[in-house]
């Protein structure tokens, strides 16, 4: 180690055996010869590896393209001979740097640390250098080179996937161009259409469109003209119940389909009204549909409505900021729950309007107010863009939002910024059970940047008396200024302060869920924040490159992780849309008794059809059944049972008595309970299953947990694990779509378990079990057959019976 050593040359590190890596060495390597060596061996280095020589440490300072490794046993020494500068016996010889080989034990220890922390800090590097007898620079460059090689391998794999996708798109493009060159044919008879026929058809279409526009303008003038005795009464827009089939043809069909939430279906005499939730006899108030508006894509009645809505949103923003930053006496900490409780008298004194909050205290209405704070692992701008995009917002809260739409953009920006954007929206909120009616909301959403790293998103329902907007009597829920403040924190996190303040019309709720809905847990701020934290962790883990091996078994590539997590998210979202009490799902009680009876549990039935619009589900008529019940068990104990691989044969009717083992396990959050798992029968029983696996997605937060699973062919899942697109994989999910505390702290639990930190307490659990089965391969089938009804109800009742038996509470009775 002389002081006059010249600067070394740069070595080609891709040829070094120590850095010939594969993803299996990072994610799935087991203890063995390969693990002890630490790296894969390239073709030209097999003899060196077989001789037991350790890999060479390569760094940015001791590498050169022309260097070769010394074969000296001591692991140190000069590499090759000396190069003479003058060739005439000069005494100045260029001395090459000594290269030190790492022993197998050194590589093993550094690999173990790399799996836990690919980016060690200075303290960790110093500790490793002292432990292994290496310099801190050697440790630093070893980790740097390892990360570089892993990134290169991942990029090559992703590039190959992108290349194959590009070739596929090019083939489709060529096929479409060839098809466009062919002459057009009539869709009805198949005859080639001539240019004269096409011109005549276009002329007829234009004439018909002009006639419809004239009739529409006439009807619009008649509807908007109030009678002489009611000029002071507010305008009520027409709904489907007020319009006959002849007038329906004059309405904006796109607006009807968008607001009603129907998947583009129409009846013979007009637009078909979607079935409404009938999950309880007194829940018929849920049958009201979103109002229809006969403006060309517009929602406002007058041009001067926009300034009034902007003024309303500005006032709501000021109130939201005050509600988020206020302490006592506006918000009082609850003694039993520890959550913030709104002091309504103080709220009216500080914030509320000229009428003193009388609108919130109308007969037949209840007021719910809650506030929650939490840290979210996502940057501020990503959250802001997600909240202002209705599709992304709905996908972010699959357990809470069943339908959502943007009605009209009031204020927008030409660039991609979101500061000052104001839009009118519609949403239908749900609890994951058919026994609780959904909540329909029409509101204005306003996004405003308050400071450099501080944003506010406020929702407020619009009042026709102040804005002139088409407010409908069908709206059953009203948003007082609600929303969230987002403040940027360090390490890519942000602080979320959420306020949920609504008033709803009183409606009959099943006794099972009265405590949950009355306390505000079902639709409160705490549930919104918990769901947001869960989904943000899922998105972060989907793109993370430093996931420990124990949290990513069975999948060796980043693209594979993304594909599997995307498939699991689609499975859970599909089951959430099916199980809620939305107007689109006409739930009815299943007949009790017989082989399909559910015992004392009420089983709800409905059906839906897939005419080929969703490639991720089987086509035809699908029978759906769900049952909600109370179990005298802590939610943690119930969740532990459902996740226990060894106890799954006790309750899973899809694997009756079959022992299973986990083939894939991907964590998607800090809590390893949130994971995606693929189960398969053990090798001695796998032949009986015919290559069927069970894909399961577990999502848990302090407010509720969901467990969605579905049978899937192993041959269909393997390409997804390899990183290919999962949109075409057929899944028909089922599962325990909702496990939440019952809200009755005074009721003693029969079975208890140690709770995780921060989990909601409760004496028992409210559980909703849902199953789906194909009823008919044809979507034209109108009703479910008795065999389909019996099959799906037996699955639900058998699963509940098995769960009670496994928990030892099959003899317990509900006490509500």
Swiss-Prot record:
- Per UniProt, the ranges with Basic residues bias are 92-101
Q: State any GO BP term from the record.
A: negative regulation of trichoblast fate specification
Q: What are the subcellular locations of this protein?
A: Nucleus
Q: Which Pfam families is this protein grouped with?
A: Homeodomain, START
Instruction: Answer yes or no on keyword Translocase.
Output: no
Which keywords label this protein? Coiled coil, DNA-binding, Homeobox, Nucleus, Transcription, Transcription regulation
Q: Which residues form a coiled coil?
A: 149-182
Q: Where is this region: Disordered?
A: 26-104, 265-296
Where in this chain does the record put each START domain?
Answer: 302-541
Where is it found, in Gene Ontology cellular component terms?
Answer: nucleus
**What GO molecular function terms would the record report?**
DNA-binding transcription factor activity, RNA polymerase II-specific; lipid binding; transcription cis-regulatory region binding
The record's section on Gene3D superfamilies has:
3.30.530.20, Homeodomain-like (1.10.10.60)
Recorded hits in InterPro entries, A to Z, give: GLABRA2/ANL2/PDF2/ATML1-like, HD, Homeobox_CS, Homeodomain-like_sf, START-like_dom_sf, START_lipid-bd_dom
Indicate the residues that the entry says bind DNA: 95-154
Kindly indicate whether the keyword Transcription belongs to this entry. Answer: yes
Role noted for this protein:
Probable transcription factor.
UniProt family annotation? Belongs to the HD-ZIP homeobox family. Class IV subfamily.
Name by which UniProt lists this protein: Homeobox-leucine zipper protein ROC9
Write the gene name.
Answer: ROC9
